[in-house]
């Protein structure tokens, strides 16, 4: 393990240029403490510069990294950073880096990097490894065992760059690509790709050369055949032979024409079947479309134009609606302003009239409220008269009761939340298991589909190979027979002893020349009979070969045909039986296709309905939340509360305000009557000197009269009326605010009852969609299996046709053999009978001449036969070699198909196991959810009960506080207002509000109409498109019916059978002509000069053609194999990169989750993770390339969101620290070093403590491994206390400024912090 030991800093930033400062790094913890600006971060900058050679941000120019020369009064300052470290194998190194800052005459500063060094210390010996800067950067990274990207972004991350995990996507991708060293592996793949492309170009050249060499090889073979043919030609029979050849060519052309005509009729038959299937499909599509569309009478062109213009129409309607909505909002603002003015005027109208009466009424109301509240909340001792002291005591007691209820509710909510969290965790665990099973199931399904595609490709390649075991056996049988014929021909040539016989006959010929003519005629006749017998032998041989070929074919494909047709199948009925089975399989494939298409259509409809339901649910949820916020805002404004009350209290609050307003208005009416009454008392006392109530005389009782007048004067004041009017205005304003949102409250209540039912519908549609997906997957599987079987049967179809053709050929050959036997059995006169009519001499002459001719011809024939058989043997050997190669390739393909089928079965078993696991998990999840709902309802009931008690007490306290404050305010208010001006203003405002409301109602009607048109647009658009599709299908159906009728009228089957029969007849005639030509060619002699010319040409140009072709063919095949190997190698590297990346990301995210959950103290984020999204790009020359896009996301429950732009500054700091710790854990296997610079920035006290405890746990866990070097740089000594640093180190380093304001490093005891 590598580690750093000491760091020396000289002339860097605030460190002086004359005396170096040194710091030693300990294991497992090194602490660096200092106030802001003391130079702590410079330590990290120097470590990073020493290891990577990179300067801090914004310090690459103008010498910002070097000590300012002006501070020391010098023109030049040299900075030096030395780092002592040990490599991964324990070697001791010292890296030194030097940098210079020079101030020139024009005060321009020049920064220059000087030569550094890497020193190896080994047993007292000091060896300089390198002094070049570029080599230093590479060597230090290698010796530490850490890539430069990890040193830069993880281990020695600068404070300015510490939040890089929260940077924008492009910068984040660049960081992670450097960390994963993606460019190295990308370059490897690119090199392999270029090499593969180069080999592909070479393959093209080799294939062209192969074609040329093959042509030369075929040309050489052709020359061989021509040379063999020339040896058998006879000049006397050339014209006749040419005539026969011409006749044969004419017959071949006729046969070819017949087969081509038959194939054209066969194509018509296939077209008829294809069009019939398409017609059935079109009919089904027409019925399905007709069931769901509303037919439109407009022409197609009008519908297409309407469809094209639909988007413009909708945009125009939306713009019109938005314009009217803007007008509505403007009117609404004007109406709100008018209402506010009206409310203010109405409040001012009655305020001064109700002050005094309200004051007295509120005194009575307060006593009544206290008695009622005491009785309601069981507070004893408040049934009698109440004075101010007892009222104050009551307020204190009820406030204490309210505080107790609040604490009780908080405790209950905390306990309930803990219970719900435990049950939610159970559900989350099972849901996680379910998602894992679903992912496994999807992977297995994808594997099945992939294997199916591979099998289809392999099956297509297999179908292209016409060679089978039967063909090989047939070729080997031909070779064996040909070898026997060669040996027999050679034996006949040796055993004949023809030279001696010819010599003996030549001695007799001169004696018997007179008898040669008659003997020659007899020989011609005998030769004709011999020809007939030879033709009979040829036909018997052909018949035997075709029977043997039929036997080989039936034995080879017996297993496949037995599987399809049963064990008792016969070649005679094979074509009809196989055609029936093939048609049944085609019908089965069609049925599976129809079912799959129907289910797919049903799935599309289900997805459309589910999407609509979800959109509606989201829309209604947003509307409900908006209504709830509006109602809560109005309640908060009406009561002037700090926080919004529950929306369910709206009706209670509205009824309370209405009741209070009625009471205030009643008090105002009573106030006027009381004022009249007190005016009468005052008038009587002044006029008649008597009390109006008791009729007491005030003569000689001036004191009593004065007291009465003073009391009446107080009653006649306007203060109480003023308070009543203010109360009236306040209640009216509150009621206006609450009544303005009554519609939204009703909407909220309605949506609260509708949304659960809509959620259940969404769940039902979701389950239906999942059922349809599973059904469609099963139907896809059944369709692929049936289609694969159909392809296998179609592959066998050519063998069926070949067996059928062999049966017909055998039948025709048997008939020809029978006719030849009849011709050869015709009786002719024998040689003895001829000799009886001739003289003995003539007969002997003819016999000798015939014998000489026969011996000569036999000698030449045997030579030609041996040569011809040798040529045929070479050709047959090449055919056998090619057949063996193709059979081996075919065997490899069949084995590959078998492996793919086995893999498919394993994947199907995995899908079945996943389905069983899902069926088991669904009831468990449902049970857990039911338990959670039941617990939630029970908890909610308990909380509601305590909350109701708290709210009742809170309402009492609120009402008492309100009435007490109003009573106190009455003592400070006074002064009437003018009513007339207020009434005129109110009338004008009411007229204005009525006009505005009318305009708003008209705009609302128009906007609703436009919204309805927009909502119905999608359905209309889809209906128009379906109408066009429906009409197109009708036209195509009519066209197909006409085409089918035309094809059926052509009677293609009868013409096909007739043409095949005529072709067989022509083949028989051609066979006869061929037999005649072969007989004549056997009599031809070889032209020696032509033979020599061909032989010279062969020796000069074509002698090595076969070897050259073989060499080129080997190069082509080896190059193909190399290209395939390069492709597999490239795929293997790509797969290894994917696996490595997935493994590392999983390890990093696991570490991040553990650190976050043990550190973060908030409840808004459960965990964070790094997401790497794979993006594949395809190009024509480089294939598919993968890129990774990274982002940091936060998770709460089942919700995942991007963290960038959504989290606080403290969460950014904490997340960045945790991500760096996780990256160091994963990528620093050879170096347990990491530095944290001011890790507590922007963190609150709870998270600071938690981070300290987590770091303590990490150090403790890694301490035993001996490879951890954690460097913590901070100004927060409380944070170090929480870390309990004394467990890991005895001292720390303090960075501070000396008297010259230079930074110095001082070593101090850890007890300075912990005490």
From Swiss-Prot:
Residues 220-261, 321-429, 472-553, 589-674, 748-952, 979-1115 form a coiled coil. Keywords: Chromosome, Coiled coil, DNA damage, DNA repair, Hydrolase, Metal-binding, Nucleus, Zinc. Its cofactor is Zn(2+). GO terms for biological process: chromosome organization involved in meiotic cell cycle; double-strand break repair; telomere maintenance via recombination; telomere maintenance via telomerase. Pfam families: AAA_23, SbcC_Walker_B. Its main location: nucleus. InterPro entries: DH_dom, P-loop_NTPase, Rad50/SbcC_AAA, Rad50_eukaryotes. GO terms for cellular component: condensed nuclear chromosome; Mre11 complex. Residues 722-928 form the DH domain. Zn(2+) binds at residues 691, 694. It catalyses: ATP + H2O = ADP + phosphate + H(+). Component of the MRN complex, which plays a central role in double-strand break (DSB) repair, DNA recombination, maintenance of telomere integrity and meiosis. The MRN complex is involved in the repair of DNA double-strand breaks (DSBs) via homologous recombination (HR), an error-free mechanism which primarily occurs during S and G2 phases. The complex (1) mediates the end resection of damaged DNA, which generates proper single-stranded DNA, a key initial steps in HR, and is (2) required for the recruitment of other repair factors and efficient activation of ATM and ATR upon DNA damage. The zinc-hook, which separates the large intramolecular coiled coil regions, contains 2 Cys residues that coordinate one molecule of zinc with the help of the 2 Cys residues of the zinc-hook of another RAD50 molecule, thereby forming a V-shaped homodimer. The two heads of the homodimer, which constitute the ATP-binding domain, interact with the MRE11 homodimer. Component of the MRN complex composed of two heterodimers RAD50 and MRE11 associated with a single NBS1. This is DNA repair protein RAD50. It comes from Chaetomium thermophilum (strain DSM 1495 / CBS 144.50 / IMI 039719) (Thermochaetoides thermophila).
